[in-house]
Amino acid sequence: MPRSVRMIIILTILSLFYITLFVPLTPTVDENFFFSSDDPQLQSEILIDRLFVRKSSQLILSATGKIGDNQYQNKISEISKALAELDGIVSVNSLTSEGPGSLRSALNSPLWKRLIISNDRKSTNIILILEEEKSSEIVPKVETIMKSFQDKDFLLQAAGLPYVVELIKRNLLRDLRIFNLLAFLIFGFFIYQIFRSKSILAGTMIACLNACIWTFIITNLINIPMGILTANLGTIIFVMTLSHIIFLTFNWRAFREDTNCKDPIKDAIRRTFPPSFWSMLTTFLGFLSLLTVSAKPLRDLGVSGAIGSLVAIVVAYCVFPAFLKMVHPRPRKKSKIEHYEVKTYKAIDIGKQFIIIIIFVTCLLTLPGLTMLDSDPSLLSYFSPSGKIHQGLSYIDRNGGSSPLILVVRTKNGDKIHSDKSYKQLWALQESLEQHRAVGSVISLPVIIAQAIQQTPILGWIMPRHLLLEAMEMSINDKVAKSFITDDRKYGLFMLRMIESYRTLPRLDIVEEIRLITENEGFYLEIAGDIYILQGQLAKLVIKSLIGGLSKLILLFGIIAFIVSRSWRITLSVVVSIFVIPLTILGCFGIYRIPLDIISAPASNVAIAMGIDSMIHMIKAYRRTRNWQKVRDELWQPVLTSMFVIAIGFGIFLFSTFPPTQRFGGAILLGTVLAALTALYIMPLLSDKNRLGEWIGSLRVKINQLATKSF
C-alpha cells in the first residue's frame, strides 16, 4: 500500500473520530427554524413580545369520546393531572383543569366554548402551555402519557407547532440515518460493478466520505448547524464528489488503454479537471446566490453547499488519484451493468428523435403547471394523508384550527381600545373574524372580559371596565389581560387559530383579507405575527429565491458556457437545454399539485448543477474533436453511469415515509434523467444549425405522413 494511501486512511479515521466526538449530527429543528432572530420577518414577533405577555408555545391535545359522560370527564381530569406534573409544562387548561369545570359551563362560556369545545361537539381540547426551551424534551413525555390513557372510547390526538417540529425532526433524523446510508451503499455497489476494482471502490468511498465529513466539520466550525435543509446535504456532497470521480475514472481508463500514453492518471486529470472546475464554479456560485434570501434554512444551505462544492473537487482530485495508482493493469471485461448500459445507450441512440420529441412535448405539457404551483403548503403536507399523524392534525385543524395567527390592532380614531365605542367595535370584529372561512377560533379582549363578567356577575357588571382590566392584570388572575391589551390601552390583541385543511389561497392573501375585515370594523391592523404569517412569508421567499435563483443560475451557466465554448450558438443551446430541467420538474409539481415545501424546493437547483456538469464536459470534448457524434461516443458512458448511479441513489428516497424526502428524491431523480438526456441529445442538436434544420425537416415529413394516413 503506497504511503499516500496510508496517510489518507489515517486522516479519514481521525476525521471520523473528530466528527463523532465534536460535531452534532442531529438535525436542529426548533420553533424558530424559519428565520433567524435578526431577519426582518421576526421583528414583528419581537415587537409583539414587547407589547404583550405571550404564551405562544402551545400544544393542543384533542380527546374524542362521549364528552357528556362522567367516565370521559374523569379521564380528562386524570390526564390533566398527569400532564401538569411534567417538568416544563407551565399550565394545563382542560374541561376539568383550570377550565370551566363541567361540559355545561364550557358550552355556556364565551371563552371555553371557543377554546376547548370542538366544532362537531365530539371532542374537547387540552391546552398545554410549554416552556419554549424545553418543548423538544416535553413532547415525547406527553406522547407517552397519551398512549397510557388512550383506548377505543378515548381517542387522543395532538397538534401545535412544538409537536409538528418534533415529528419533522424525527423524520429527518430517521431518513438521515437510513436513506443516506442506503444511498452510500448503492453508490458503492454500482461503482464496483462498473469498474470491477476494489481500489477504485475504496478510493471512491473514502473520497466521498471525506468530502461529507470535512464539509460538516467546516460548517460546524463556522456555527452552521445541521438544519431542515442541510440534513440531506451529505447525499448532495457525495453526489457532487462522485460525479467528478466518474468522469475522471473513465478518462483514466481510456488513457490507460492508449499505448502512447505514459502517465494515464496525469493525462486524465489534465483532461478532466478544467470542465470539473467550471462545473464546480457554477455550483459554488449557485449555492452562494441563496445568501441573499432572508430565510435562515436557505442561507444555511447556501453556505454549506458552497463549502461542499469546494471540498468535493479538492477531494476528488487530491484524494482519489492515489487509489488509481493501486489498480493493477489486467485485461478488462465488461461487467453486466456495462452491458446493460451499452444496450440502453443503443436503444436511446436509435430512438433519439423520439427522446428529443418526448422531452420537448413533456416540457410544453407541464408548462401550465408553473401557474398552479402549491408553493405555500400547510404543515399537514409534511405528513402522509393516510397516516395517523396527518389524520390527527387534520381533525384538530378542522375543529378550531391549528396554525396560530396574532393580530395587533388599534382604533382608527385614536380612542382607547377599551372605551365603550371601541369595545362594541371589538365585538363586531370578533364576530366578523369568526365568520371567515379560514379562521377556526378567535380569542380576544372582549371574550376575556365577557368571561370575567360571567364568573363574577355582580362585580363584573358594576365595576368599570378599566378597573376590571386592572384586576385581570393582577398575578392572582395570571395577568390574563396583559396578553390582550397594552399598558397604554392603545393596542388590542386577537389570537386566531387558522384552518389549513381547506385553504386554497396563499397565507399572505388570507392575511390581507383579514386586514380588510379589520379596517372595515374601524381598526388598523398594526402587526400580524406568529407561525401562520411566518410560514406565508417563508413560502414567498422560497418561491422568490427559486425563481430568482434559477434565473441567476441559468444566466451564470450561460456565461460560463460561453467562456468554455467560445461560441454564442453553443451558449444558447446550453441555456435552452438547462431551462428544460427546472421547467419540467416544477411543471410536474404544479400539474400533479405536489406541495413545493422548503425541503423539496431546492431539488431543481441540484438537478441543474448535475446537468451542467455533463454539458461542460461535452463542450470541452467538442472543442477538442469538433464533432458531436465523437463526443457522444467518448462521453456517453460516464454521463449515463453518473445518471444511473445518482438516479438510483436518490430513487430510494421515494421509499421514505416522510413526504418531503419523497418529493426531494423524486424531483432529483426526474432532473437527473432529464439532465443526462438533454446533455447527450438536445444541447448538441440545438448547437448544430445544419443538424437542427435536418431534424426539423424530417419531423415535418413525419407529421405530414401521419396527417395523410389519418385522412
Predicted regions: what is each one?
Residues 34, 40, 351-470:
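Juxtamembrane segments of multi-pass membrane proteins
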Residues 42-43, 74-129, 137-141, 166-170, ...:
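Extracytoplasmic
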Residues 83-89, 295, 399, 430-437, ...:
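Acidic-histidine catalytic/liganding microenvironments
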Residues 74-83, 138-146, 421-433, 507-517:
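Short amphipathic alpha-helices in soluble, non-transmembrane regions
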